[in-house]
């Protein structure tokens, strides 16, 4: 054991993370499990492997690690895996930008394709889907290695032998297995239906991936003609006029009752459309009568379904006007007008449609400027459209009240931390407007294990899917051939075609409990850890990850996948805006970690209450600086105590701590020492209860408050007695230092491990969590009054602008119940350098003070 003369935090991360990994102290040992209650299992969030982690990841993953370390010290066998979410759009976009490539599924596979980083869109080259996926996997693996380095530096006590990816063969196998299970049970189905569509990514989007943004627009008033009158409607989307299939008004709106059942003619395109009543129409919105297009928004979908209207789509998957006029446009004038729109972007189509309306005087008045909410894909930059597409869905309770009630009940069975987050889950569940859309028209993702028979013209018969045998999983249907067919029948008449859609990333991430627990590969492991003890996650993905995981678990196991869930808050920038990579205000943690150290950053994260948003100013991170000061103080306090146990006669040489154990509690007899241990018991109890309730900030504050009081007051009071070799003081210092190191170990693992190594040859992170000492004697008020005494003495010297070393010839001081501290007056007088002291019962204050030789 080599204790430095001046303890330092530098280098501790590298020193101890290597030792932890090599000694495998955090590995989950299945053979040690004798009963489920021995295990504490964590369904760790797999971070998206696309670029860099930001400070928000450090924040929330620290919260989880604190609980993992605490439970391990509580005697649990902790299952704490790490996954990488390398499946989906973020990875695709990163690969496109990094290598300047675009995926073209029509191109053949190029073997041994090697590409370097380019980052130049103008030089983008097209590659095959298989080559594109290989690049995604290559770049993801590089990112994952960097992520693992950062997590190790942060001190996460993850079992690195329990890792998984959401796009490797195991993940594909598991996802395809449960998809086929869902198809067989009727929980998964295919439908041709209106779909929210992102024209930039050219893929369907689920309800859970939508966000509303306030957009400035205009209401345009258009004139529709019928036999007797002009009907005026207001719309923000005149470009959809060619897709109008009806006008709708509220059945009780007297302005339009006489029109119900009649028809009007659309301007420009001359289409005859009905005027119909529907209670979803809003009399106070616009002119009170609405144009129904297929489709402008979700309300259009509702009207289309409820009123059994025809479909007249005019937008393609790229967000342009379709090439051919829809069937309802039959007039020569209308078809000529549509031809001028064909192929235009929607913004160009809007401009041209308005020009045509103005030219025939079908625009009434001036446009009315508004700000209104518009739906966007959370990762997109253009408003969502609604297209009729073929998609795969999983039933989520949208149209099944019994399933909704069951999912609500499963939510209530969980312990939510904080409890208020349950309401978000329930609100989402009761506000669904569709089943869960799980198919995506992208390239990187779990392939659907499906082929379709073709008719005698080679067209896919989507109502006649071919499913594989479970023994053939995992597979890619664009490469594999269904049983009973040969490769030369692919795409041929009376042959087969592959499903080219891939599963939404949440369709795989919803199975992380099964994936991390190796449901298919190691049933014994899964049985030991499921249901998991904890799902930690962010509040923004309750509607996606948490909700979808409960659905999949209900279908697979008829139970919730965890017993509790801990929801972290957001990290805000100094302007109180949420930090995120998409907004460009997220800070990477490396610079902060390098500058202040992992323990300091962990301290900052631990100070925040669970579920509460926390601001961070990286230019002046006050709490991080406080955390660094705390970690350094732990080292200095431990060094002081260790050096007190050097050879008492010569006070030289290295300390021999082995002779200090086991601790002889009978040696503790001084009233001040016993009072401190009473307060320590209180600290242990409060900290333990706080951590059991996921209140890491309270646990840290409780222990930290005790520790600073211990250092600033108790140590100063007993220092002379300890230097003199008093067994009661020495034993108390040893006991308290050992226990405080344990109490702080989940929060600042590096400083506590370093300090512990000076006392012991084992790791503090394999020790048992402290239990209360339950000493029968000791008055907790004694230490409080003693601290008040010392505070007044220090304050008096500071006010007189004197050094704390200045001696006091005479002190008259008032304290409540001063008789309590009479037994320790010798300690107090020595600590305050006081010759004579007179105690008076009363409010705490100095009544008179005379200094000896002045020391400034």
From Swiss-Prot:
UniProtKB keywords: Aminoacyl-tRNA synthetase, ATP-binding, Cytoplasm, Ligase, Nucleotide-binding, Protein biosynthesis
A GO BP annotation: valyl-tRNA aminoacylation
Enzyme class of the recorded protein, top EC level: ligase
Cited Gene3D superfamilies: HUPs, Isoleucyl-tRNA Synthetase, Domain 1
Cysteine-cysteine disulfides: none
Catalysed conversion reaction: tRNA(Val) + L-valine + ATP = L-valyl-tRNA(Val) + AMP + diphosphate
InterPro entries: aa-tRNA-synth_I_CS, aa-tRNA-synth_Ia, Anticodon_Ia_Val, M/V/L/I-tRNA-synth_anticd-bd, Rossmann-like_a/b/a_fold, tRNAsynth_Ia_anticodon-bd, Val/Leu/Ile-tRNA-synth_edit, Valine-tRNA_ligase_type_2
Keyword Cytoplasm: yes
EC code: 6.1.1.9
GO cellular component, one term: cytosol
Molecular function GO labels: aminoacyl-tRNA deacylase activity; ATP binding; valine-tRNA ligase activity
UniProt short sequence motif 'HIGH' region, positions renumbered to this chain: 47-57
Note on domains (UniProt): ValRS has two distinct active sites: one for aminoacylation and one for editing. The misactivated threonine is translocated from the active site to the editing site.
Quaternary structure note: Monomer.
Family that this chain belongs to: Belongs to the class-I aminoacyl-tRNA synthetase family. ValS type 2 subfamily.
Function, as annotated: Catalyzes the attachment of valine to tRNA(Val). As ValRS can inadvertently accommodate and process structurally similar amino acids such as threonine, to avoid such errors, it has a 'posttransfer' editing activity that hydrolyzes mischarged Thr-tRNA(Val) in a tRNA-dependent manner.
Protein name per Swiss-Prot or TrEMBL: Valine--tRNA ligase
Taxonomic source organism: Tropheryma whipplei (strain TW08/27)
